[in-house]
Each structure stands twice: as structure tokens, then as C-alpha cells.
Amino acid sequence: MSGHSKWATTKHKKAAIDAKRGKLFAKLIKNIEIAARQGGGDPDGNPALYDAIYKAKKASMPADNIKRAVARGSGAEAGGANYEEIIYEGYAPAGVGLIIECLTDNRNRAAADVRSTLGKGGGSLATNGAVSFNFERKGEIVVPSEGLDFDDLFEKAAEAGAEDVIDDGDTYTVVTAPSDLITVRQALQDAGVDYDSADLVMRPKNEIELGLDDARKVSKLIDNLDDLDDVQNIYSNWTASDDVLAQLDEE
């Protein structure tokens, strides 16, 4: 039930070092607005909103920004955009599969930007289902590993109904069935476990191991896609050796 996701470690470090604060906040605000629109503005009765707000607080978003995003999403305040959720499937270099989740108020712009960025990075759009068959929807709870015993977390997570616990170095990732995400998150909170985020994600069933050159191309393409205003999340099925990831981490 335990494993080690080396790319996740590099990804978390990279995000911590060079995260673009403005774009990060914009994505988090969209998450809050959508959650409030779909489930109401009370986080106590809207678990998705609770987790969106929690994630924003972890990123040090000012409380006033969060409050206004909730108000716009719930309709208590004017100004909320009418975001549409769109999922694109694509290929990066070396045949790596990508799932690109967008929240946009302009479908044509989102499609054009994603297509253009893929093309410039040596990738392409794929037909629906061509990539997603190799992914499955899961819940993920990211927990800081410092001061927390893996076996202790493993036991608590398993008792709460988690499917897996992965050691990513600086963090542990608790994997759940989509329908169990909130239950497991609440159980860990009740047990005094701090967490960074709780999200529904797409996890690859099979991964492609890349050498340095291809890993560099793929990570650059993913970074460029992530910079697009309409893109919320990107999931891929690539991995690499510790040596390759260490070199990427230094660049």
C-alpha cells in the first residue's frame, strides 16, 4: 500500500521555490467561486468549499480575497464570472499522456491557447478517451511528513478507508476513492493530522519513464500549460529516475 513518487517530490519542491503567486491565487479563487456556486457559501455545509478555502489559506491568501471569492461564487456579491469546466486530452513529447482541466469563461480562447501551447512544446491534442483510459479519478490528501510517522499515518488512513499511502519525501499522499475523500480527510483531522490539501485528481494507471532530455521537454511543456490563465490542473503519466529528477530540480 506504500510507494514512492519521485516526481511528486520534485514537483512540490519546484512549486514551493518558484510558484507564481498571482497565477496561483487566481486558480485558487476560481476553485472557491465554483465550489460556492455549486454548493452554497457556507463551508460548514459545503465540504468542497471548505477544502478550497483551506487550500487558499495554506497558500497564505489574504482573508479578504477569500471572503470576496465566496461572496461572488454564492451570488451574495456581483462580479463572479460564469466559468465552464472543460477537459482536454493531449500528448507531450515521448508519447506522454496529458489531461488538462480548464475553468474558463471563453471556450474558444481556452481551446486555442491549449492547442497552441501543446504544438509549441512538441505535443498535440488527442481525441476524447485516447489518454483518459489510462487515468482514474481518485481523492488525494497531501500531508506534511515532518514530525509524522509514516506507519502511524498509514494506520489512521487505512482505518478511515483510504486505499493507499505514498511516501513522497517531504509529504505523504493519502489516496482514496473519490466518494471517500471527505470522510478520510475528516477522520485524519479528528485524529490531529495536519494536511496541505484535499482534492479530486486523475492518477495514471501506468507511467512512462523518461530520460533527461525528454523529461526536460515534458516538464517545460507542463509548466507552460500551467501558466495559461484558463488551465486549473494538469495530470500526466511520466516519471523518471532519482538522478534525472535531481538534475531537473537544479535547472
Swiss-Prot record:
GO terms for molecular function: DNA binding. Keywords: Cytoplasm, DNA-binding, Transcription, Transcription regulation. It is found in: Cytoplasm. GO terms for cellular component: cytosol. The keyword Transcription applies. Transmembrane segments: none annotated. The keyword Mitochondrion does not apply. One of its GO terms (biological process) is regulation of DNA-templated transcription. Belongs to the TACO1 family. NCBIfam families: PRK00110.1 (NF001030), PRK12378.1 (NF009044), YebC/PmpR family DNA-binding transcriptional regulator (TIGR01033). This is Probable transcriptional regulatory protein BLA_1344. It comes from Bifidobacterium animalis subsp. lactis (strain AD011).
